[in-house]
């Protein structure tokens, strides 16, 4: 049955990426990309057949062996380009991109040539572009091509994000990690990992490599779990907890920035000013500063590097306007990120706080009602809308979020508009001076996937178009 199914599958090879390994007696082992829809159903059926046909655990063992071998072979193909690079990997549920960007700015200020690969931006030797791959970690081939280009450009430090998916899929096997930063662990990706324990174990694969330096969040709920891993060199913790080696002693929030004080090793006082607002960004900054301190970067370079980071696409990104309202686009798509974002924004908002949000399809469904509940409790107004439905029914996604909103008995705050552009338009149109509008979930992304189709889309650009329309109408009225 398995052989027959594989023969049928071979006819469909142009439709999706797959890899074949042939073994004796004409059996096959195959790895199929993460797909959904009709192709996803076929994939699931084939996996069921394989589980019945092969010995228990053989499918998972063979898949892991294949992924390990694939990474090694591709590394060889590109001439083992990661060797000779000083690679810093940032992992965690939230804050990876911002932390990586802070590290990048500090190292550049210290005179190092760097390369950066994050969900939002890619940069090699000062040449930056938006990451439009819709992937935090690219394919293995693209990753090693990135390393190769960095090496050719004379880069010394590479800073990148290491996701739980990439670590589980052995994308970093054989990559020499000099430093690992763990930002936090909160609910996300349970569609893939199933449990928080499995999610934590996937993140811990980075620490199992025994990098020279490890930086951990002392305030994080999962700190004790990750603290059991040792570094081959030094480990540093950061946070508001007095036991943290980099102790955050003072934070002052402003509308367009933050000031903070760090006490490192009970002796070094460091005063920092950043353009990024919010306590959550101060934590990201503290992680970056802790690593820079371990690397021996001068304190003045750390301070200047932190101050150099102006903004990150789709990360608390303000959209300029003449309407007298604050419009912020942010990537927040987990309960923890949304909660912290709403709490921070409330502190710097004079008027009402309006949230425009939805949830991504084909992802962890359990977080949807949780995010709905958070929105109802922390926002003054809610515009519930669609995000990227992938192959799910968007009505069902919104219904799950709505359950959380209705649980709070605050459904009167909510206006449901499926069309995302219309939801943003109505939020902007109904705002008054002093209000803040948060548009979350998509951040920097350049397209949406709806019903399996890739549609060009960017929240910031859509907001700018709507602002232009509103401003034109107001000018006509004044005439």
Stretches found by the model and what they are:
Residues 34-47, 51-64, 234, 267, ...:
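ATP-dependent carboxylate-amine ligase
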Residues 168-169, 190-191, 223-225, 245, ...:
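Glycine/Thr-rich phosphate-binding loops of Rossmann-like dinucleotide-binding domains
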Residues 126-131, 274, 448-452:
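Short acidic, glycine/proline-rich loop/turn micro-motifs
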Residues 1, 10-12, 20-22, 26-89, ...:
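N-terminal leader/targeting and accessory segments in enzymes
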Residues 83-85, 153, 177-327, 403-415, ...:
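Acidic, Mg2+-coordinating active-site environments of NTP-dependent enzymes
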Residues 45-218, 222-233, 286, 292-295, ...:
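Phosphate-binding loop of NTP-binding sites
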């Amino acid at each position: 049955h398995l052989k027959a199914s594989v023969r049928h599958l071979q006819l469909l090879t142009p439709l999706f990426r797959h890899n074949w390994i042939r073994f004796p007696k004409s059996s096959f082992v195959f790895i199929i990309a993460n797909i959904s829809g009709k192709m996803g159903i076929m994939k699931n059926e084939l996996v069921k057949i394989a589980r019945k046909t092969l010995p228990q655990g053989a499918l998972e063992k063979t898949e892991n062996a294949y992924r390990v071998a694939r990474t090694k072979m591709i590394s060889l193909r590109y001439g083992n380009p990661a060797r000779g690079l000083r690679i810093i990997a940032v992992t965690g549920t939230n804050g990876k991109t911002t932390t990586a960007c802070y590290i990048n700015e500090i190292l550049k200020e210290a005179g190092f040539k760097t390369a950066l690969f994050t969900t939002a931006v890619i940069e090699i030797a000062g040449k930056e572009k938006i990451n439009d791959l819709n992937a935090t970690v690219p394919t293995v081939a693209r990753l090693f091509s990135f390393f190769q280009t960095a090496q050719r450009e004379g880069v010394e430090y590479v800073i990148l994000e290491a996701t739980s998916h990439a670590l589980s899929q052995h994308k970093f096997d054989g990559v020499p990690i000099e430093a690992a930063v763990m930002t936090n662990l909160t609910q996300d990706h349970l569609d893939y990992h199933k449990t928080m324990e499995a999610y934590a174990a996937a993140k811990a694969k980075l620490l199992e490599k025994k990098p020279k330096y490890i930086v951990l969040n002392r305030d994080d709920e999962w700190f004790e779990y990750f603290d059991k891993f040792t570094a081959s060199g030094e480990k540093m913790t950061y946070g508001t907890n007095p036991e943290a080696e980099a102790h955050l002693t003072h934070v002052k929030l402003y509308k367009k920035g933050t000031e903070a004080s760090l006490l490192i090793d009970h002796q070094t006082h460091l005063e920092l000013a950043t353009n990024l607002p919010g306590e959550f960004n101060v934590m990201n900054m503290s992680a970056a500063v802790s690593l820079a301190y371990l690397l021996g970067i001068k304190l003045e370079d750390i301070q200047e590097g932190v101050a150099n980071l102006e903004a990150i696409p789709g990360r608390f990104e303000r959209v300029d306007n003449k309407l007298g309202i604050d419009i912020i686009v942010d990537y927040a798509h987990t309960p923890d990120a949304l909660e912290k974002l709403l709490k921070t924004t409330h502190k710097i908002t004079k008027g009402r706080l309006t949230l425009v949000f939805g949830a991504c399809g084909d992802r962890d469904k359990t977080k949807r009602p949780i995010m709905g509940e958070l929105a109802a409790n922390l926002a003054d107004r809610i515009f519930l809308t669609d995000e990227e439905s992938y192959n799910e029914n968007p009505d069902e996604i919104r219904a799950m979020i709505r359950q959380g909103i209705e649980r709070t008995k605050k459904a009167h705050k909510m206006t449901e508009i499926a069309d995302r552009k219309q939801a943003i338009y109505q939020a902007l149109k109904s705002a008054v001076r002093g209000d803040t509008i948060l548009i979350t979930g998509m951040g920097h992304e350049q397209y949406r996937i709806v019903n399996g189709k890739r549609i060009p889309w960017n929240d910031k650009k859509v907001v700018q178009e709507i602002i232009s329309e509103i401003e034109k109408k107001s000018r006509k009225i004044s005439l």
